[in-house]
Amino acid sequence: MAKISGRRPGRAATRLAAAAITAALVATGASAAFAAEPGDAPLFGLSGVDASGNAYTYAPQGDGTLSARVKIDSGWTGLAFVGQVDNNADNIADGRWQLGTAGNIYYYEGNSPAKKIGYGWDTYNTVVSVGQFGGGEGGDLLTRDDKGDVYLYLGYGDGTVTKRLKVGYGWDIYTQIAGNGDLDGDGKNDLVARDKSGVLWLYKGTGDQKAPYAKRTKIGSGWNQYNNLFAAGDLNMDGRTDLVARNEKGELYLYAGTGNAAAPYKAKALIGTSGWNTYRLFF
């Protein structure tokens, strides 16, 4: 396979990646079961890119655990971000965005060739696929630059996005930002952010593109024990959005969603005993 390294891989790589993720979901029955319940949390499974550029995916088993990994592709080097996106609100990923370290961002869907949707994105130190966050037609992207300014790109539903909208500032206080789904049961997608002292905060979504999130509320402290927080959609197939967290030892924990803003996550559950620090990106 052609290496990515800031440029797009060929159609074969795109097709293989989509097929591998779909196959992993179908093999567990997850795709069909979840597709019958539209309007719940996204069912994306969990995928990762390791330091060598190999990409793997894990399907949810329905109890919070994950299947054995399936290799998607190789040569995924030079990437700063990969994010899955659901563009038609059926809770299944339709495609993915990939941002190269050179600042070019592409969209991939099915057998279609890669679509370049932007450039100059190396100005951002964080990019998050947040789902339908600002009332757009498709999934949106949230970004943060080195100054701490936050921008929202509304999705058109075909992988392309609008011009950016500045929706916040001062977010350089956070070391992790995650979100792709509804955490409080109001039907609007939310965000979580961890500050430098290890406190995790909830930003409830409003659905308003000009002010897409409400004032933050505290979830809890001690979250600096993790080096990666990622919102992978619904991993235990209960219809609620979950969070995965990895620590320095390479252990992976599931924080299952509750749908309650006052306590949006259940107690952590160990779902990966070791080896998860091989991944430098989750998507």
Residue ranges and their predicted role:
Residues 2-283:
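Trp/Gly-enriched beta-strand/coil motifs that build multi-repeat beta-propeller-like domains
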